[in-house]
């Protein structure tokens, strides 16, 4: 199926603004370590099927894995958050691995792809906020705030790995099937879907955990 090739929203080619990795760190008042504290890195980074080489993933039950290997944020979305938070946004604050210029998270759908050099990423799911995220932001209400904003971050699988660095141009291609955007996926996350809606989700290259949930719901319906 043919994919639509996109350029940046303002007519300029997209590019990698930042690549971010982190080490295991303890949250204040918590006994466990987290990899959410990420910082922009200089120079080239290898991205393989598990994500950015050298990046810490502490809670493997909910983070990381082949269908959640790279967490992407769009610069237009982060500009919005900067205004919302009333302070400059530092890359890595939300725990993202990659920031892409001229990209609004709300426009991205499951199955869309990001391509640069040898690297090919495919969108699988949206970021769902958790208590660790709220603690990172030092705001106990941040889960509700992030959900209400309806601009969730973007999880990707690695179709083909490669070495990348900040400043590299990024090509963006749209999934040719029915769109399941990040805001829609966030709104329906974990819900029981019926009929055409379930079929539409299963027709997209969605995160394997969501696929398993939807397939189990279909089995229960029979």
Where are these regions (language model features)?
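Electropositive, beta-rich accessory/interaction domains or terminal extensions
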Residues: 2-134, 141, 177-222
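Short alpha-helix capping/helix-loop boundary micro-motifs
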Residues: 100, 107, 153-160
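Loop/turn positions that initiate beta-strands
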Residues: 111, 161, 166-167
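Residue-level signal for inorganic ion chemistry
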Residues: 118, 167-168
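Active-site glycine-rich loop that binds ribose-phosphate moieties when present
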Residues: 137-144, 149-158
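Hydrophobic, well-ordered secondary-structure segments
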Residues: 152-155, 167, 182
